[in-house]
Amino acid sequence: MGESDAYYNGGQQQQYNGGYQQQYQPQPPAASYQAPPQQPYQQQPYQQGPPQNGTGNGNGYMPAQGYNANEKGSFDEQFKIAKPKYNDLWAGILLILVFAGFVVVSGLALQGYSANKGNAGDGIYNNKNDFSPNTSTVILFMFVLAVAFVLSYAYVWMARLFPKQFIWVTGILNVCWAIGTAIFYLWRKYWSAGIVFLIFGLFMAFCFWTWISRIPFSALMLKTTIDVSKKYGHVYLVSLIGGIIATAFSAWYAITLVGIYVKYQPAQDNPSCADGGCGKGKVIGLIAFITFAMYWFSEWLKNTIHTTIAGVYGSWYFNPHNFPKDATRASAKRALTYSFGSIALGSLLVAIIQFLRQICNAARNQEGADGSFVGYAIFCCISCLLGLLEWAVEFINRYAFCHIALYGKAYFAAAKDTWKMIKDRGIDALINDCLIGPVLSFGALFIAYACALLAYLYLYFTDPAYNSDGQYTAVVMAFSFLIGFQIANVFTTPISSGIETIFVAAGWDPQVMWRDHPELYNEMVRVYPKVQQVIKDR
């Protein structure tokens, strides 16, 4: 398991400096709950964190009221921040300004679209606009949104109803779908899309084959999070609300995108160009801005949902017999107030990388359409490198936001503390062997493939005049893929949030796992024996 193996096998106990907290000593419960028998060896809570934020309670983790079974405390009492403040406020303000800019651009674009509605058309066929995407494209995007919403919602419910079979079904269907659509595109001689989808399909088939041995552990963790979500908090309600917001914003983005083309695309028969306000550079610049804004807002929404759900699962882990009555509401409030800037900052880093990847993919598709295989290969390599960078930043984000959800620290400090804990505890071994993150990415890709295929078929059968030479096929498919992928990611966020929070919480205080969740701990040891080295036998 890489560094974690060296850590385990070296036989050296982590040496800590002075001034760290005392080992948490659990108080006997006041009700009839019987604690498991005392283990012969007790692993101390992680001594270098998490930060106490001025509370001075001295424990290895924050909740101080978690074991009084006769009284339910609130989330804010159990995860108290003594001196709360708005962290990384500049990033939150910048997000608001970017969103305001999106609103302004959208208003201008929609005003132009409305003023030229007769030219843009009011249906799928017989539109006068033959120089840019028009009302027919808007209708296409509405179909894409509907498909993305329905498939994403069904995918989450499949995970809820069949957690054990979920991983197998996702992997097999995704590989078959990717390769099948690739063959279809190649048959249609749409070489750029066919080659890309074929490469992805074969790569995913290889990955899934290498993951088979890790499926039992992953299935156990998925089943655990699903079971918790059915009993505590409002996990699926948060997922549904987030999905609705993501779908509505994507619809807004899609209409704005078409409006920019209608208002600013230079063409002799474009009535909007009568005052000389059109220009290809203006179209490219505005589309780049709204696409970046869409990436950032979508990431912020996804991470806000993740942080909210992390508060729910953190409450369950530390207080299974005294679950706070307002966990979901209070966690969401903290994510939208004190942690708003921190979530915006982490989301900004990912949005920048995603935006660069989108530019790279557009350039790659253009090179493929022009028949330049050298340029196509170069942009493929750059896209892969950006993909690796995006994965690394998202990995850090996911676990840092679990820390932020419970302890309210600033982004960079939380990321640093959490990363150090993960490496010192060897939690990275559990994370690497849990497939839920990749499986959910597979599911999101499946939905994105479906949306892209729908866009291709729509353009093929309707044959709009503006796409007579196929010049907009790659653009429309790319944005359809993007919309489907982002909506699916928002819907599935709560599923992975639970597992990630359990891993982080187990790293901060492993004692809680085998003391308050003995059945889960024993089952984890059965399917993945190395858990003992991470959670107890250190």
From Swiss-Prot:
UniProt biased composition (Low complexity): 1-54
Organism whose genome encodes this protein: Gibberella zeae (strain ATCC MYA-4620 / CBS 123657 / FGSC 9075 / NRRL 31084 / PH-1) (Wheat head blight fungus)
Subcellular location per the Swiss-Prot or TrEMBL entry: Cell membrane
Cytoplasmic compartment residues: 1-88, 159-165, 213-239, 302-335, 394-434, 496-538
Topological region Extracellular: 110-137, 187-191, 261-280, 357-372, 456-474
Function: Probably involved in transport through the plasma membrane.
Coiled-coil residue spans: none
Membrane topology listed for this record: Multi-pass membrane protein
Encoding gene, per UniProt annotation: PNS1
Residues bearing glycans: N134
Transmembrane segments: 89-109, 138-158, 166-186, 192-212, 240-260, 281-301, 336-356, 373-393, 435-455, 475-495
Family: Belongs to the CTL (choline transporter-like) family.
Keywords (A to Z) from UniProt: Cell membrane, Glycoprotein, Membrane, Transmembrane, Transmembrane helix, Transport
A GO cellular component annotation in the UniProt record: plasma membrane
Stretches for region Disordered: 1-67
One Pfam family matching this protein: Choline_transpo
Protein name: Protein PNS1
UniProt-recorded Gene Ontology molecular function terms: transmembrane transporter activity
InterPro entries: Choline_transptr-like
